[in-house]
Amino acid sequence: MAVGTSALSKEPWWTLPENFHSPMVFHMEEDQEELIFGLDDTYLRCIELHSHTLIQLERCFTATGQTRVTVVGPPMAKQWLLLMFHCVGSQDSKCHARGLKMLERVRSQPLTNDDLVTSVSLPPYTGD
């Protein structure tokens, strides 16, 4: 995205076809899913609303109890969530703390363009 362009459109994100072109799909451990989305996915809807995304959780019947996570929405919002998911699951205490702070942010209030731009401008974490 070019500097000076808006990360979040003034139009509802779900009305823009480009937000559905490249869904983000990955697997998450069951305990991490519960930490992020809460017991019985209590926080799923508010995370979707606050991150301007749609998140689908599909429990997989595997030995490790993984969940397939599919996210659609504005590219920078998906990138922000991916960073948050990574940090929450990190073994590094600083990265994990950063992820928990991001999680509290997205649970408590809508993400702003500043949130999205700030998170993608941070240096990538390479400690895991």
From Swiss-Prot:
CDD domains documented for this protein: FILIA_N_like
Gene Ontology CC terms, in alphabetical order: cytoplasm
Any GO MF annotation of the entry: RNA binding
Family matches, as Pfam families: MOEP19
Top-rank lineage group of the source organism: Eukaryota
Cited InterPro entries: KH_dom_type_1_sf, MOEP19_KH-like
Family under the similarity heading: Belongs to the KHDC1 family.
Name recorded for this polypeptide: KHDC1-like protein
Source organism of the structure: Homo sapiens (Human)
Protein's gene: KHDC1L
